[in-house]
């Protein structure tokens, strides 16, 4: 494995998820205090578990694997680090409708990967990552 990163939820996402505790408590309190606290705690813990279990992984060996996407390194033309401001434009007004995007809103940096496969209409892939330089280096160093 040349590169591996798990895209864990950010502190902000976890803070927002923790707000489900008082909401669940208020919703379940009419059924009794014990039931209310049990539902609130179990519901919030379940939400945290779901957030961590469903966190996607980026890995690079002979293929780039992100979620269900799998791309052979041999069809990658280039990989470049994208910062916050450029990322906003790239996935917004300057986006190509044929591009593949794997974006997490709580991760502010990404890598843009040009695809050189003549059989694939996808011009590029944009992947959110907290370690864009390392991912770009791993992709470019192992293309052949």
What residues fall within each predicted segment?
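N-terminal membrane-targeting/pre-transmembrane regions
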Residues: 1-28
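Non-transmembrane, membrane-adjacent beta-strand/coil modules in membrane-associated proteins
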Residues: 68-126
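Pocket-edge structural micro-motifs
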Residues: 5, 115, 129
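Cytosol-/stroma-facing membrane-proximal "stalk/adaptor" domains immediately downstream
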Residues: 130-144
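Short acidic, gly/pro-rich beta-turn/loop elements at beta-sheet edges
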Residues: 13-15, 123, 135-137
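Short, aromatic-rich membrane-interface segments at the entry and exit
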Residues: 31-40
């Amino acid at each position: 494995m040349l590169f591996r990163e798990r895209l864990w939820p950010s502190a902000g996402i976890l803070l927002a998820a923790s707000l489900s505790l008082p909401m669940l408590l208020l919703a379940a309190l009419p059924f009794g205090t014990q039931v209310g606290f049990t539902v609130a705690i179990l519901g919030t813990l379940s939400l945290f578990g779901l957030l961590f279990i469903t966190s996607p992984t980026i890995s690079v060996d002979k293929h780039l694997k992100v979620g269900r996407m799998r791309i052979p390194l041999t069809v990658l033309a280039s990989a470049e680090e994208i910062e916050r401001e450029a990322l906003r434009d790239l996935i917004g007004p300057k986006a190509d409708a044929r591009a593949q995007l794997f974006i997490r809103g709580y991760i502010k940096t990404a890598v843009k990967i040009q695809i050189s496969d003549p059989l694939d209409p996808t011009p590029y892939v944009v992947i959110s990552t907290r370690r864009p330089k390392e991912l770009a280096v791993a992709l470019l160093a192992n293309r052949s």
